């Protein structure tokens, strides 16, 4: 079966988050995000939002969701209190239409922090 052309694929948004927690894995981040989305919006809402963690490195991670559900996703991220058994806070840094655009938020954030 051939893949769908780009015009027929579902559009997605990528949210760059800063993870303020101890040492946690990408799997722990996904579980915390999925549980938070399910708790806030139920199974039907979670199926509409399609949460996924596509990248994590150090204190940053990129979470994917369906276009049009960015606000619900950021609300769910703000409600996370635990990840991997330890206290955690997920702070939204940037929302973008591509992974590369979301990653650019890391360098911009660091540039502003180091200008002092």
Regions found by a protein language model. Name each.
Residues 2-6:
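Short beta-strand/turn micro-motifs at beta-sheet edges
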Residues 9-54, 93, 102, 106, ...:
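Surface-exposed, low-hydrophobicity interaction/linker segments
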Residues 18, 62-64, 91:
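Beta-strand cores of modular interaction/reader domains in eukaryotic scaffold and signaling proteins
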Residues 55-62:
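The conserved glycine-aromatic submotif of the RRM
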Residues 64-71:
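Helix N-cap motif at beta-to-alpha junctions
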Residues 80-116:
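Long, charge-dense
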